[in-house]
Amino acid sequence: DEFARSLGKKGDSRDIDSYVHKESKDGGVRVLSLLRPLKHPESIRPLLSVLDVAKAGLLEIGALDAPVGEAMGALGCSGISTGRVVIAPRDGEWIDPGQVRVMLDQAGLSEWDIMEDDIDEHETREWLFGVQDELSKSSPDVTSSSLILPVDQHFNVKGVGLVAIGYVQSGSLSKHDEVEVLPASDVGVVRSLQVMDDDVEVAFSGDRVGVALRNLREQSLHRGCMICVPGDGALVGHESSSFDLELAPFQRKELSIGDVVHAASDLQFTVGRVSGLEGSSVVVDWDSPLWIRGDGSSRVLIVQLDAVPMRVMGRASNFQKTG
């Protein structure tokens, strides 16, 4: 928390702490948004939720233990190829940077840097801004894609009404747009939008946005529900799915028929049971619909909660609806 506070102003906090840093430069405003999962390793869901929206990583290491290995494996599975490890040994600990490098390479994080000694928060912020700029240049134009906005939290605000908060994963959202909330299939209208505490007319891909909604039942909102454009087919509901499973780094366990698993994707955490296995091909029947992007761009991690110390089984690819 101390390291994160040095990089940005602490905002809302539940099972994820958020930090924001704004500064003026060249006549404009630059913004960094940082998320820090809490309760890990006791609970893995906050870490997975952060990875659903993260573009780069900062991993502070106080000791080389199983939770660090799990975090590295999850980062590798999520394709977070840009990042830094900050070595900050706990009292009495000594951490070998060479061993950290070996673990990073094994986790698929070979491009990550390792930082030791006193960390300069100004240099770290400049590095993060640089990463942000590079990612914006190299990323495809997701603003022109269909709207996908997973909801992280929601509440009622006096004088405003129902507000949903989440990250715009693709597309854009404007005031007065008609939207649909899945899986409830309820339709409402955007009353107003806030990004970084500022009222805006449009929220774009990558923005953490507060969406005030009217003509919508509060019961239709919950963590992991999706806001999209009615009828555009951006998301497909899966009652059961087949996929290829690429085992996570450091994962020694294999799935068996009947195993209970969770799928983590776009802030969803959907439980299911393995009903078919053939080599690396897996079939899972979901307890409730798992919403997958129609264009095939969903990033899905398969998790087994009792597979400690490495609960991330791996990354699913070639996702197909079987029911």
Question: What kind of feature is each model-predicted range?
Answer:
Residues 1-16, 66-67, 77, 81-114, ...:
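C-terminal effector modules of nucleic-acid-centric enzymes and ribosome-associated factors
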Residues 5-63:
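Switch I (G2) and immediately adjacent beta-strands of P-loop GTPase domains
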Residues 26-29, 38-39, 202-227, 254:
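Conserved mixed alpha/beta catalytic, RNA-binding, or beta-rich assembly cores of soluble enzyme
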Residues 42-46, 67-74:
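Well-ordered alpha-helical segments embedded in enzymatic catalytic cores
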Residues 50, 172, 202-204, 220, ...:
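Residue-level "contact hotspot" at macromolecular interaction interfaces
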Residues 50-51, 55, 68-69, 76:
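ATP/nucleotide-binding catalytic cores
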Residues 56, 173, 178, 208, ...:
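Residue-level marker of beta-strand positions
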Residues 107, 112-220:
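Conserved catalytic-core segments of large NTP-driven translation/proteostasis enzymes
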